Amino acid sequence: MFEKYPGKMEGLFRHNPYMAFPPAVPGLPPGLPPAVSFGSLQGAFQPKNTNPELPPRLGPVLSGLPQKGTQIPDHFRPPLRKPGKWCAMHVRVAYMILRHQEKMKGDSHKLDFRNDLLPCLPGPYGALPPGQELSHPASLFTATGAVHAAANPFTTAPGAHGPFLSPSTHIDPFGRPTSFASLAALSNGAFGGLGSPTFNSSAVFAQKESPGAPPAFASPPDPWGRLHRSPLAFPAWVRPPETARTPGSDKERPMERREPSVTKEEKDRDLPFSRPQLRVSPATPKARAGEEGARPAKESVRVKEERKEEAAAAAAAAAAAAAAAAAAAAAAAATTGPQGLHLLLERPRPPPFLGPSLPERCAGFPEPTWLAGPPRLARPPRFYEAGEELTGPGAMAAARLYSLDPAHPLLYSRLAPPPPPTATPGTPHLLSKTPPGALLGAPPPLVPAPRPSSPPRAPGPARADR
């Protein structure tokens, strides 16, 4: 696939593609230039652009367009330094590298973890031990721990893959990995004191699988045990030893708890005999021992008989309470209705007054009771026709029907009855059947005389303003 693209693809790890840029502040290491062109960096799938007609993606601007000046002004440009000058740090690093290479030539099967490269490491473990205390990495990851001087220090021996690809007959296929046995060769100071106490063949699985197995190496107390212990600020509950917890101690506690209850029952039982008599006459002397009325001795009291008497008294009290409840229920049933409501709430009440009944309304209206004479039904009111005179006893009866006195002619002339028939026949009356002709022939005074009205207008075309 790579034959299609011309040119040579160079790796990014063989040379530094960036140019050193002098620092603006003295004392800082040199960094990258402010603007780096990535046109020269060709990846695996980014071929070089060899066609002159197509512009590159990240290349310069087209030649037809005006190009702006990319030069930095003089007052912003940092002062240039001559290349080739080394500072003290460069000299120290070069010296340490040279010394390390010389030592590796003399002792090539050992790795040199220099403490002077890392003078102080953060954390409670301190610096690394000298390089002579650490063995070759091949012995950490191989089954036999053999040393191969000519082999790559980061590759394992061919025998290391034996237990995984072709397990032997004398090795358990589900056994422990053999790499932990090689890790036990580390000294106590390796990795800040985390070496052999935990990475030996017998102590890795010693706590869970074989607590009684003898340790392979004599080591100080396990430093990892401090992580599983409770801190001093929270003291753990101290369990009493087995010698202090005797078999009888657990059985004695319930007995101690039952003793106060037993004594309380005895006190309650002796309470009626220990109380003094409340209704004792002052003239009656107290009974002595051996006389009548004296308190019986404690030994003569029979507990069983007393309990039987108490049970009989309780049964009698329960029977009396049941009889009283039955009597109360019977009395309540006698004073309650079918729905269980009290009869006082359901007593009959007078029905609401809805007016006289239909026969009473047809018979007529009764006279008031305060009128003289026996009560009787009066005639219904009579409606007179127009022109009928209210004269004679009928007018008086109609006036008395509503308990009204006849109107006085001097006070209420309009409501007064017509004059007696002794008057002259030509006198006009208010309700006379034959009114005088003068009243009928004269026009009413409030109605104006008819005027000639204008002739009606003929319907024409509708006006535009409407």
Curated annotation (Swiss-Prot):
There is a cross-link at residue 8 (Glycyl lysine isopeptide (Lys-Gly) (interchain with G-Cter in SUMO2)). InterPro entries: AUTS2 (IPR023246). The modification Phosphoserine is found at residue 281. The keyword Ubl conjugation applies. It holds the Pfam family Auts2. GO terms for molecular function: growth factor activity. Keywords: Isopeptide bond, Methylation, Phosphoprotein, Ubl conjugation. One of its GO terms (biological process) is positive regulation of fibroblast proliferation. Residues 236-315, 410-466 are annotated as: Disordered. Residues 248-272, 288-311 have a biased composition (Basic and acidic residues). GO terms for cellular component: extracellular space. Residues 442-459 have a biased composition (Pro residues). Transmembrane segments: none annotated. The keyword Thylakoid does not apply. The modification Asymmetric dimethylarginine is found at residues 229, 239. This is Probable fibrosin-1. It comes from Mus musculus. The lineage of its organism: Eukaryota, Metazoa, Chordata, Craniata, Vertebrata.
